[in-house]
């Protein structure tokens, strides 16, 4: 099969041939139609994580395709010909501390916190190939109205911001105000998700490109209620307070690694507001604990969501026709993908299309 792989750190991906994966009895084989590229993929290529990136790794953890083989120990939840999206965590062991903690809360096995998990596109082969082995417990059947190209970024970007949104808005009511700080691929989806869930939304970015991205939202029903230029944070704060009648926002999700953006977003919260942290700053950031104590604020981290939560996300995507702005590249352009991603004019998400939509 055709595959792209890491031949050298921080160098363009190489293209070549690899054997089609042999699936285990508890796995399915997916014919990849679309696979996304995000900042984590760049970090993998640059060997930036604590655990070294394996040379020869097939990258991409945002994968959508069609089931072409099912292991003999799999149930019938997924069948041949099903269109699916694949979350990148695979094969929870069920016995480690992370698995025990998940199951103690009443959840099914959740490989996100499993100490022995496999991670597609990070340390195990991912989606920049014609076929990939998938874990059926973290692979989701797609609604008919969700195309494979659109599904790919939902499997990481979508699942990440959706998971944060579900957590920071727990207990909120429709009509409460949610702010999204940083309007790239995650922020663009997060605003649509929040609007679909009935919240008023504030889109915040110091870049004209980010503000333009949401101003040109494909659906009027999903456009933010307020778009704010945060290059002048004092003016931006006044605009947001005026919009919320001096209360502040009920929740804010920060989709940027900027330390100043995280600090400032905390000041936007109303009493008992919640800050969702998604961007990872390059160094530790410090905050004033006084307003956290006296206004009873919360700061909440969020990993990419699990399969049950992702299923709810897909239902909302289908109902509201939520879409990413995509730059679609053919397989042969994969060696140029980093240059495309780092172009200052780039907006939205990159998807490599290996096969036509079905």
What are the roles of these predicted feature ranges?
Residues 173, 269-270:
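Helix-to-beta-strand junctions that scaffold the AdoMet/dcAdoMet cofactor pocket
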């Amino acid at each position: 099969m055709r595959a792209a792989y890491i031949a050298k750190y921080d160098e363009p991906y190489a293209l070549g041939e690899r054997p089609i994966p042999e699936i285990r009895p508890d796995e399915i084989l997916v014919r990849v139609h679309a696979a996304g590229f995000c900042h984590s993929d760049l970090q993998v290529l640059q060997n930036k994580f604590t655990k070294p990136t394996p040379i020869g790794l097939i990258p991409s953890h945002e994968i959508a395709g069609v089931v072409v083989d099912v292991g003999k120990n799999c149930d019938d939840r997924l069948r041949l010909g099903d269109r699916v999206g694949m979350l990148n965590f695979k094969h929870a062991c069920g016995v480690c501390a992370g698995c025990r903690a998940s199951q103690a809360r009443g959840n099914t096995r959740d490989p996100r916190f499993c100490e022995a998990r496999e991670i597609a596109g990070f340390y195990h082969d991912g989606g920049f190939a014609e076929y990939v082995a998938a874990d059926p417990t973290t692979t989701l059947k797609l609604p008919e109205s969700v195309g494979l190209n659109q599904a790919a970024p939902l499997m990481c970007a979508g699942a990440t911001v959706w998971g944060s949104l579900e957590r920071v808005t727990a207990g909120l009511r429709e009509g409460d105000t949610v702010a999204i700080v940083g309007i790239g691929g995650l922020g663009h989806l997060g605003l649509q998700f929040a609007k679909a869930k009935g919240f008023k939304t504030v889109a915040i970015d110091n870049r004209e490109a980010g503000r333009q991205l949401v101003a040109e939202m494909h659906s009027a029903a999903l456009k933010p209620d307020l778009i704010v230029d945060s290059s002048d944070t004092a003016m931006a704060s006044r605009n947001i307070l005026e919009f919320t009648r001096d209360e502040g926002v009920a929740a804010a999700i920060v989709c940027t690694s900027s330390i100043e953006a995280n600090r400032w977003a905390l000041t936007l919260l109303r009493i008992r507001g919640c800050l969702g942290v998604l961007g990872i700053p390059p160094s530790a950031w410090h905050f004033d604990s006084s307003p956290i104590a006296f206004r009873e604020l919360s700061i909440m981290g969020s990993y990419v969501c699990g399969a049950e939560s992702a299923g709810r996300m897909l239902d909302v995507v289908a109902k509201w026709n939520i879409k990413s702005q995509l730059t679609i590249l053919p397989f042969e352009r994969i060696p140029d993908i980093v240059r495309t991603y780092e172009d200052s004019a780039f907006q939205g998400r990159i998807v490599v299309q290996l096969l036509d939509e079905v």
